[in-house]
């Protein structure tokens, strides 16, 4: 976008004559600059998030690089976008979870947390002294009444529930791939889902849109199931097992 076209309206949170908030548009573009792609898929008995893992330097300890965050024992998220913004938003989410539990005496439901994080993000679109976060949060958890839950919170302060969603560099390609999968297999959204199928689908989505065979060191996967309800980050050994199952299917 040319500077002459924005006429200074992109310098702060202020509407242009065309009704646009350029800082928000730039925040959405910033999500893609990290070069990572993440997906989330919800079934009847579980919900899964998967994302790429890239180590920017050979001397960095791989264990210190992550896009997956455990917000409570029962809720987790994958953050896609600018890394410092991701850490800041995840830290705030953990704080909100703790505050809710202290105030009400029970764990915060996934939809309540998603709405709260969206409200906080939306505040950054109202003040000239603030800027939107360049990150998309895909949040998962198990609701006591509604079962598996999958939400995405964007820089504009919008949160939406999904059957499947994506974020990052290959967001549109991943969305198209998932739409075809759900169209060809509508049972995913109606009947009981085997959690292995969701994990394999998440991996195959990333491999398809990236055009590469991924190793366990290239992936991070988190899952919540109706069995134990807790958010679990899969180990490299578990991911290797799923990659083997995917290879056998192909």
From Swiss-Prot:
What S-S linkages are listed for this chain? none
Q: Does the keyword Cytoplasm apply?
A: yes
| Pfam families, A to Z | Proteasome (PF00227), Proteasome_A_N (PF10584)
PROSITE patterns noted in UniProt: PROTEASOME_ALPHA_2 (PS51475)
GO CC terms of this entry:
cytoplasm; nucleus; proteasome core complex, alpha-subunit complex
Alphabetic keyword roster: Cytoplasm, Nucleus, Proteasome
InterPro entries per the UniProt record, alphabetical:
Ntn_hydrolases_N, Proteasome_alpha, Proteasome_alpha-type, Proteasome_asu_N, Proteasome_sua/b, Proteasome_subunit_alpha6
Where is the protein found, in the record's own terms?
Cytoplasm; Nucleus
**Which biological processes are named by the entry's GO terms?**
proteasomal protein catabolic process; proteasome-mediated ubiquitin-dependent protein catabolic process
Membrane-spanning parts: none
Which SUPFAM superfamilies does this UniProt record tie to the protein?
A: N-terminal nucleophile aminohydrolases (Ntn hydrolases) (SSF56235)
User: Where is it mostly found?
Assistant: cytoplasm
Quaternary organization = The 26S proteasome consists of a 20S proteasome core and two 19S regulatory subunits. The 20S proteasome core is composed of 28 subunits that are arranged in four stacked rings, resulting in a barrel-shaped structure. The two end rings are each formed by seven alpha subunits, and the two central rings are each formed by seven beta subunits. The catalytic chamber with the active sites is on the inside of the barrel.
Report the protein's function: The proteasome is a multicatalytic proteinase complex which is characterized by its ability to cleave peptides with Arg, Phe, Tyr, Leu, and Glu adjacent to the leaving group at neutral or slightly basic pH. The proteasome has an ATP-dependent proteolytic activity.
The family this protein is said to belong to:
Belongs to the peptidase T1A family.
Q: What is this protein called?
A: Proteasome subunit alpha type-6
- The organism named in the record is Dictyostelium discoideum
Phylogenetic classification of the source organism:
Eukaryota, Amoebozoa, Evosea, Eumycetozoa, Dictyostelia
């Amino acid at each position: 976008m040319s500077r002459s076209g924005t006429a200074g309206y992109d310098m702060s949170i202020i509407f242009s004559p065309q009704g646009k908030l350029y800082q928000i548009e730039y925040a959405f573009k910033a999500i893609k600059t990290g070069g990572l792609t993440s997906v989330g898929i919800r079934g009847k008995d579980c919900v899964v998030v998967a994302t790429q893992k890239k180590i920017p330097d050979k001397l960095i300890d791989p264990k210190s690089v992550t896009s997956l965050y455990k917000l409570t024992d029962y809720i987790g998220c994958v953050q896609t976008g600018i890394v410092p913004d991701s850490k800041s938003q995840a830290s705030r989410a953990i704080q909100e979870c703790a505050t809710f539990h202290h105030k009400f005496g029970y764990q915060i439901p996934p939809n309540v947390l998603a709405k709260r994080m969206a409200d906080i993000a939306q505040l950054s679109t109202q003040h000239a002294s603030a800027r939107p976060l360049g990150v998309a949060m895909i949040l998962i958890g198990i609701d006591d009444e509604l079962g598996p839950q999958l939400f995405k919170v964007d820089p504009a302060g919008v949160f939406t529930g999904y059957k499947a969603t994506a974020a990052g560099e290959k967001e549109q390609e991943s969305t198209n791939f998932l739409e075809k999968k759900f169209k060809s297999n509508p049972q995913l959204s109606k009947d009981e889902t085997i959690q292995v199928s969701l994990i394999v689908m998440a991996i195959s989505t990333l491999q398809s849109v990236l055009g590469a065979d991924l190793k366990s060191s290239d992936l991070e996967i988190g899952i919540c199931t109706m069995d134990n309800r807790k958010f679990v980050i899969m180990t490299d050994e578990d991911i290797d097992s799923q990659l083997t199952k995917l290879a056998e299917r192909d």
